[in-house]
């Protein structure tokens, strides 16, 4: 039975998240419906990670086993035909060894968080960025962000309902880059805790607003208490952009 690796993009706004829910629309649910419509039997689609409600992806990766061999480009096109009109697209399909696991074979996950830093309302990117009207000191945010690099107990930046066995994670990259009104937070790690990226971003925004210093951010990390976290950034600015294998 061939195993296929799928690279997927989606607008997370209409979904309860990646994970299948019986009564709510999910990205996994519409993908599994498209696979079933293509191959004729119910088929589980396994993602590299469970993005939350409202979180987007330009490079989510999934795998599925289909009891029929398709040319990868034909499978991609068939799935896209059945995905319409949902805001989900299969960008690429590949046949991979049956040892490939979208989640467990992943070596690194790359996220970007997009902020528009201006007083004017959003006209074109509603639901795709976080508008922060107060001027942000992006240089201070970047300097503070480096205090989170490395292996730490990230309990402060972990959702209280996170089911991970350990709060320890190793953060490989956390950069803050400004281009005009656009402030982008770029982060890479092998894996993250539930809501970790949005919690870090929200706390960095406090630094950018002058409410916290870099030392305050480091103290919040060291506190290892969820209550020490700053604001949690909203989901609409977050994108899963790439998964490395």
UniProtKB/Swiss-Prot annotation:
**InterPro entries membership:** PsdUridine_synth_cat_dom_sf, PsdUridine_synth_TruA, PsdUridine_synth_TruA_a/b_dom, PsdUridine_synth_TruA_C, TruA/RsuA/RluB/E/F_N
**Keyword Phosphoprotein among record annotations:** no
Identify which residues the record assigns to the active site: 52
SS bond partners: none
Which major enzyme category is it? isomerase
Q: Name one GO molecular function term.
A: tRNA pseudouridine(38-40) synthase activity
List the keywords (alphabetical).
Answer: Isomerase, tRNA processing
Q: EC? A: 5.4.99.12
Please tell me where substrate binds in this chain.
111
**Domain of life the protein comes from:** Bacteria
What function does the entry list? Formation of pseudouridine at positions 38, 39 and 40 in the anticodon stem and loop of transfer RNAs.
The UniProt entry's sequence similarity note says: Belongs to the tRNA pseudouridine synthase TruA family.
NCBIfam families xref list: hisT_truA
This chain's protein is named tRNA pseudouridine synthase A
This chain's source organism reads Bradyrhizobium sp. (strain ORS 278)
Q: What is the lineage of its organism?
A: Bacteria, Pseudomonadati, Pseudomonadota, Alphaproteobacteria, Hyphomicrobiales
């Amino acid at each position: 039975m061939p195993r296929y690796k799928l690279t997927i993009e989606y607008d997370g706004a209409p979904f309860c998240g990646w994970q299948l829910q019986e009564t709510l629309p999910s990205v996994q649910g519409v993908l599994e419906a498209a696979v079933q419509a293509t191959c004729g039997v119910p088929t589980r689609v396994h993602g590299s990670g469970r993005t939350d409600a409202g979180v987007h992806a330009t490079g989510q990766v999934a795998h599925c086993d289909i009891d029929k061999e398709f040319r990868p480009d034909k499978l991609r096109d068939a799935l896209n035909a059945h995905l319409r009109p949902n805001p989900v697209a299969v960008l690429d399909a590949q046949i991979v060894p049956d040892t490939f696991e979208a989640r467990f074979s992943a070596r690194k996950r790359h996220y970007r968080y997009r902020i528009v830093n201006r007083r004017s309302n959003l006209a074109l990117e509603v639901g795709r960025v976080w508008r922060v009207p107060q001027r942000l000191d992006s240089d201070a945010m970047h300097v503070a962000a480096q205090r989170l690099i490395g292996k730490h107990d990230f309990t402060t930046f972990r959702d209280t309902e996170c089911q991970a066995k350990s709060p320890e994670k190793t953060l490989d990259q956390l950069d803050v880059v400004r281009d005009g009104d656009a402030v982008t937070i770029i982060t890479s790690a092998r894996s993250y805790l539930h809501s970790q990226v949005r919690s870090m971003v929200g706390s960095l925004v406090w630094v950018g607003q002058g409410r916290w210093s870099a030392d305050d951010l480091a103290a919040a990390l060291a506190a290892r208490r969820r209550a020490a976290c700053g604001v949690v950034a909203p989901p609409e600015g977050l994108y899963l952009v790439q998964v490395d294998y």
